[in-house]
Amino acid sequence: LYPLIDADVLLYEIGFCGEYKDEDGEHKIREWEFVRELLDQKILDICEAVFNSQPPTLYLSATPKLVKQWNRLHSDNLEWKPNFRIELATKKGYKAQRKQEKPFHYNNIAAYLLATYDCKLAIGIEADDAMAIDQTESTIICSRDKDLKQVEGWHYSWPCGKQLAFGPTLVDKLGSISMSKGKIVGTGLKFFYSQIMTGDPVDNIPGLPKYGPVKTYNLLFDCNSEKELYDVVETCYKVVYGELWEKELREQANLVWMVRDMNGEEPIMYEFPNG
């Protein structure tokens, strides 16, 4: 299998391993060489866990700084543009609540990855979307991001802290959902449709009012086709929004959908079963 690695996750995971508090509670920064070795080893561990048959490609969500670095390295002329979801979100700002401080070595890690590994910059979309676009029968998405599990194909999540490893596992198109600690976890279209209902607090996506995880799970668990999933979700949106149901449903679906294809520079949105 050919690993597609979510480097957005590594920027933070490895970055925060590069700092600590000593016995006096003072914030300390580890040497870059320590962080670099940790990063290289993590990438190697991921590749070995999925029995890779060729070197990985690492995916990064573009920032203006990363685009400049890319252009210098590749004598390219890419132009940065923001994530398309920012413009789509009308109820809440997409990821507007995220105020996480970047680790000290964040930029060092990004620059090192671009200079050392085969990387792809996701411009106007997220690294997650770029990985979903490139997923084939011979690739495996390697990420700890739950959203990517809606994508059909091979998946692997490496362990980190209390988060256990997932896979390598083959996800089918319909997928499945289950309840874990009061939340819906799952794969494929079932997980995608559940997100349309519940939203995603991590990304500041509101979902459908008054449809939490338990209620949504009970409605979608027994669905055996894409059409059944859609019919349930459409009915619920009509109950809440009346004549505005289609607009509201489309917005939430476009926000949680992992893009699978592009039309030039524009992402192609999900097509519901009824068109």
PLM feature spans:
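Extended two-metal-dependent nuclease catalytic cores across DNA- and RNA-processing enzymes
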Residues: 52-53, 89-274
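Flexible, active-site-adjacent loop/turn segments at secondary-structure boundaries
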Residues: 8-9, 14, 82, 92, ...
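A charged helix-plus-loop insertion that forms the helical arch/lid used to bind
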Residues: 64-107
